[in-house]
Amino acid sequence: MALKSGEERLKEMEAEMALFEQEVLGGPVAPTVVEAVPVALAMPTLPMVRPIIGTNTYREVQQSLEARAATLVGPPPTFVCPAIPAVPPPQVLRPAFVPHVLQRPAGGHRMPMMRGPPPHGMIAPPLPRPPPPPPSMMAPPVVGPPQPPMAPVGPPMGPMPPVGGMNPMALGPPRSMTQAPAKITPSVIQAAPTVYTAPPVSKRIDLKSQKQARMEQLSALVAEQQAAVLAAGLLDSKKETASDDSVIGPSMPEPEPVHVEPVDTSTEDKKKGKQEKVKKCIRVAAGVSWEDTSLLEWETDDFRIFCGDLGNEVNDDILARAFSRYPSFLKAKVVRDKRTGKTKGYGFVSFKDPNDYVRAMREMNGRYVGSRPIKLRKSAWKDRNLEVVRKNQKEKKKLGLR
């Protein structure tokens, strides 16, 4: 196999670089001189022919590409730096690579900027243009800030002179889009409305009227009581005179009868009714005492049963019908809410005979009254009475429990 030394390779590379620089600068190109390369037969094998690329290959390929592009596309437009629009529209995603041919001004709003021709000696041959893609594959014109120029293909070229005749508007700094400041709505801090109430009116007048009415009632009661006492005294005196008539002997002259105003019987009836209503049922529980007027409807010496788990449809009649087969049955009542009138789910049944009480506890416990089975137990209504509570407290004190 033919092998080259490092010096020969370096010489070939320098020669190729010199020819390439001459082609780029546009100078005359010397005919290519192919030096004879000594071939050293290291082994008795067939020599390997290595193709050598000539220096004019680049120019020939470039000319063929230019001729082909001229038949497909017209003369290339002069490169114009795209002007920056006053108000940039929303950004569009830019493809990874867009040729310079496709970077044309959109909408015809950009004016082509002319620049002076560079010196003939420094111009570089135009690069071959690729054939344009079909219309279906054409990318939409990209609107946005100007892209930096693409790097040249191939070895680096010499320094280029500054381009003259450029429009200063095209190369000016991009104008910042002035946005109208957002309208700031002022925050209003509002205090809570103050309510002015009228000063409380003194109730001295009402209190005075109430006191006067109370005094009138008390005076009327006192007058009634005095009249009743006088009537009772007259009756007693009449009885004494009757007993004196039975005595034998001289009798004293009878005194003249004293005319007393007749007393209304209605006042006496009211007094008796008030004396009967003096009886109160005071209950005590959790350190609180109150008067329970509902206990006055029941007899104090009866045998009472507590009936629990009653349905909403059970009333006094249904409960009385369930226990009316016992001969000593007295009363049945379902406890209801005073405000709404709904049942509280329990009630009471009373008997006069203790035997009927025991039979009802044994037979009716768990029976259906309405839509639910009834639950019975002994009523402990006496344990909450004030007298019983005080008696129990005294007994506990004697025993030393409290």
UniProtKB/Swiss-Prot annotation:
MF terms per GO, please?
mRNA binding
Q: Does the record bear Membrane in its keywords?
A: no
One Pfam family matching this protein:
RRM_1
**Can you cite a GO biological process for this protein?**
lens development in camera-type eye
Q: Which GO terms describe its cellular component?
A: cytoplasm; nucleus
Q: Which InterPro entries match?
A: Nucleotide-bd_a/b_plait_sf (IPR012677), RBD_domain_sf (IPR035979), RBM42_RBP45_47-like (IPR050825), RBM42_RRM (IPR034215), RRM_dom (IPR000504)
What's the domain of life for this entry?
Answer: Eukaryota
The residues covered by the RRM domain are 303-381
SMART domains reported in the protein's UniProt record:
RRM (SM00360)
**Bias (Basic and acidic residues) ranges:** 256-275
Record region (Disordered): 240-275
Entry's localization field: Nucleus; Cytoplasm
Q: What name does the UniProt record give this protein?
A: RNA-binding protein 42
In the record, what lineage is assigned to the organism producing the protein? Eukaryota, Metazoa, Chordata, Craniata, Vertebrata
